[in-house]
Amino acid sequence: MANIKSAKKRAVQSEKARKHNASRRSMMRTFIKKVYAAIEAGDKAAAQNAFNEMQPIVDRQAAKGLIHKNKAARHKANLTAQISKLA
C-alpha cells in the first residue's frame, strides 16, 4: 500500500475508475450479445433492432476511450455483414 498521500489518492481513484470501466464494458458486451443472439435465432428484424440499440453505445465507449475506435468499427462491420446475410 502507498505511503504518500497523493499515491493513496491515485489508488482510490484508480479503483473507482476500474469499477466504472468494468460496468460500462459489461453493459456494452451485453448489448453485443443481444445482437448475436438475434442473429443465431435467424430473426433479421430483431437483429436489426438490437444492432440499432448497440451501435451508439459502442460508439460512445470508443469515444470515451474504453475501447479502441477500430474495435468498435470491427464489431459494427462484422455484425452488419452477418445481419445482411440473414434471409
Curated annotation (Swiss-Prot):
Q: Does the keyword Ribonucleoprotein apply?
A: yes
The membrane spanning regions, by residue number, are none
Q: Which GO terms describe its molecular function?
A: small ribosomal subunit rRNA binding; structural constituent of ribosome
Keywords tagged on the record: Ribonucleoprotein, Ribosomal protein, RNA-binding, rRNA-binding
For the keyword Nucleotide-binding, the answer is: no
Task: Please explain the role this protein plays, according to its UniProt record.
Answer: Binds directly to 16S ribosomal RNA.
Q: Write down the NCBIfam families for this protein, in alphabetical order.
A: S20
This protein's name: Small ribosomal subunit protein bS20
Native species: Enterobacter sp. (strain 638)
Supply the source organism's classification: Bacteria, Pseudomonadati, Pseudomonadota, Gammaproteobacteria, Enterobacterales
